[in-house]
Amino acid sequence: MFFTKPRLHRIITHNLHHLLSPHLLLSEISGSLGDLGTLLPLLLALSLQGSIDLPSTLLFSGLFNILTGLVFGVPLPVQPMKAIAAASLQENADLETTVAAGAWVGFAVLLLGGTGGLKRVMRWVPGAVVRGVQVGAGMSLVVAAGGGMVRPLGWLWTPEENENGHGGLGEWLDSRALAVLAFGGLVVGLGQQQQQQQQSGEKPQERRKKRSKMPVQVPYALVLFLVGIMFAVVRVSLSKDSPQSPPPPPHDQPTNSAPPWTWIWNPLNHIHPKVFRSLLNPQALSMAIAQLPLTTLNSIIAASALASDLFPPDSYPQLYADDESSDSPLSPSPSASSSSLSSAPPQTPSAETPKPLSSPTSAEEGPVPLTPLSLSISAMNLLSAPFGCMPLCHGSGGLAAQHRFGARSGTSIILLGLTKFLLGLFFPGPGLLGLLGKFPKAFLGVMVLGAGVELARVGVRNVEGEEQDRMVMLMTAGTILAFKNDGVGFLAGMGCYGGFRVAAWLGGGTEKGRGGEQGLLGEEEEEEEQGRVDEESPLLR
């Protein structure tokens, strides 16, 4: 049994141990920031576009962060659904369509988790198509960042016209020049990240020696976000010099007209009944179809397997279901207690190279089993959809990122969730969205670009094997970019994969690889082709 009183008691004790220990608490706080590079860009971009309700998203995602940390006891993140977010930004989808797409995924995941259909999806959908959706979604974010956010800006300033035709002084705080500077910082951050990945294969003594000479790593998205907020505050204060009425909220998003002292989140002011009618919108269905394999394989199966790898039963027995480990002491084991930011185990998988589909058995019996994880994702989206919350899921990449930054318990995401919950509860008025409306598009574009490149890089690096697999991935990603429709890209990738299988069957090819991946070349050609592929170095590796 997973949801048992003794297990929950052990998890609470595990979380409290990390909360009350000063050096472990610092590691948990550091780990909670590890996944902000994905959350902040998409949260800001979707909020400013009017595709989500920002206060509801902060409140519900914070609440789900807290519940996830209490139930699972591991730093399992609550992330945006990236394929839906990318499609929404590229297609300028309204709030109802975006949220309805997340609700459809919630329905599907609930059905799959309740009927045991996750393994069937794992067999039916080839990995190359899933990676193609990742690459296509990532490149869609890059296109949205460059074409919709940075390109309209001026090189040194961006004119801001108000009702009286006067430009605001804040126009100097948003330009392409700022975007170039922010992009330079992003490239430096990527270089430091690559250096850390190279050190993961070195001896522990050499790695600790090099780490001691390096400055403390802070998520670049967090730095850019804080600087952008300061710029936004300055722009808001400067805009008072010339009378200017705030623009209407995009997509007719409701605002709270109550006095400032009553700006506490009220469900009556944030309910969106049109979400249910948008369930029949073909655009929402298309976005959900593209997101479903990504959620099933990466957010459920890969996250479950990765949790078992990062938190093995011999080091973290308190996180496992009641079996032979149920008689273990309530306090965390010494190896778990001594884990900190400076002593991360060298075998920790990186956020770019999780281990999807590596161990289904351990994934079902690990600290994050498949069925509870799928129920968690469906509950998050179905319960929050009427309030316009951003489509949410868990993720293996975010789990690895937070673990790398020092998170070893649910304390990290509980602290992050508490912060988001309080922001959504006490700052739901129009002032918060107005402040974000002054957030420099230069910084936002670079943040979204970084998130898109990171998402695409994961897809590119996880495609291994035959040339046909890469062709399927490119067909999927290219069709997504060409038609600006993730569903069309998914169907194109499946059609390409099916065509290769038919050609292999007609030509007497053999089936090779996990999950039905095909090896369509002969043995000699296959060895020669594989040797050539191994000599190539993927971009940003």
From Swiss-Prot:
Name of this chain's protein: Molybdate transporter 1
Source species: Neurospora crassa (strain ATCC 24698 / 74-OR23-1A / CBS 708.71 / DSM 1257 / FGSC 987)
Membrane topology: Multi-pass membrane protein
Family assignment from sequence similarity: Belongs to the SLC26A/SulP transporter (TC 2.A.53) family.
Region (Disordered): 193-213, 317-366, 510-541
Record localization: Vacuole membrane
Main location: membrane
Entry keyword set: Membrane, Molybdenum, Transmembrane, Transmembrane helix, Transport, Vacuole
Disruption phenotype: Resistance to molybdate.
Record-level GO cellular component terms: vacuolar membrane
Keyword Coiled coil: no
Low complexity bias (residue ranges): 327-351
Membrane spanning residue stretches: 24-44, 58-78, 98-118, 137-157, 168-188, 214-234, 287-307, 413-433, 435-455
One Pfam family hit: MFS_MOT1
Superkingdom, natural source: Eukaryota
Chain's role: Exports stored molybdate from the vacuole into the cytosol, making it available for molybdate cofactor (Moco) biosynthesis. Plays a role in molybdate homeostasis as high cytosolic levels of molybdate are toxic to cells. Not required for molybdate import into cells.
UniProt GO BP: molybdate ion export from vacuole
Molecular-function GO terms, alphabetical: molybdate ion transmembrane transporter activity
